[in-house]
Amino acid sequence: MMSAPFHTHSTVAKIAAVLALTLASSVACAQDSAPAASASAPASTDAARAALAKKEGDVDQATLLKETLSAADKQYSLLKAGKQAVTYDLTYSYVGQQLIQANFTDDKLTLFDIQNTRSHTVTNTVSVDHGVKDNLTASVTLPFVSKYSQSETFSGLSNAFGDISLGARFQPFALSRDLPALTATGTLRLPTGRSPFKTIDGQGLGTGAGYTSVTLGANTSKVIDPVALFGSLNATLAWPAKHLSQTRNGKTLTEVRPGAGIGFGVGFAYALSHNISTTLSFQESISARTKLTLVDSNGVASESKTSMQSSAMLNMGLGVRVSPLTTVNFTVGIGLTTDSPDFTFGMNMPLHF
């Protein structure tokens, strides 16, 4: 009679022992899994930070913005003393327009003609910069121009060197974190390209301005990471082109006196990442009337003036850093006035030594 109760108590004890072991195992598993779960969150956060962190060869955004400014306009950059930089620029521009030619003699219209002109220009430019001092940089620019034109008077391709430019950039004040950078600039443009005033009508296109000019200006820039603001102002004076002998419409062009010009530009650059930046800028230049001296078949000289010209461009750019030493920049420009190119596209690739 006593065996049954003893067997029952033994069975209950065994079941209690099994439940105790199961509960202990569950508690231990919960305690072990809690640290693992809490550790997984920091691990995933660290992985995200590592993915967004600057990699080897990347630059900080301030440095990228300065390089972007240099690509947008080299007038905003300076080199350290003894340093050199070579830059290659490829630029394409398209101009399509209708030219109306009219000649009034004794209040009578003796000549009226409408010419449709389309011009495609590709310019390959190599620029060499040298740091004379930490705050003074000298430069020389050599362009090679390929121009194709379609018109009633001439349709063909012309290839020749353009006008060589000699320039200098000077920073009068040391850089400051609180104040914008200020740079004074000067450029001498020499008439080394094919002059448009010396080409034979219907036999070629000019690849240069045809006269010597000097441009003096100043610009300022301020990097406010991740944005850089910049602006410029300049004035241009030109020497007259004399001793010409170009015959057009029965008259001979003997002298050209270009008018003075002023220009300004504003814009900003924005760093999208450590290796990609964008720019948006506006540029405008205004030139006074140019005086032309013409001699007719009787040897009588007369003077004619062109209209004032205003050229405005809206430029959008993208800079991509492809290596620690090279940033490739692409620019698209849209003409806003009748004196501007209809469309421009440019690629800039600086190589630093």
Give, region by region, the residue ranges found by the protein language model.
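Transmembrane beta-strands of outer-membrane beta-barrel pores
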Residues: 90-96, 142-148, 172, 188-194, ...
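Residues on the lipid-exposed face of transmembrane beta-strands in outer-membrane beta-barrel proteins
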Residues: 86-90, 126-130, 140, 166-170, ...
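Detector for outer-membrane/organellar transmembrane beta-barrel domains
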Residues: 81-97, 203-297
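Residues that define the transmembrane beta-barrel architecture of outer-membrane proteins
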Residues: 120-124, 157-164, 180, 208-214, ...
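Surface-exposed loop and membrane-interface regions of Gram-negative outer-membrane beta-barrel proteins
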Residues: 110-119, 132-165, 169-171, 288-290
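Outer-membrane beta-barrel biogenesis signature
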Residues: 31-108, 177
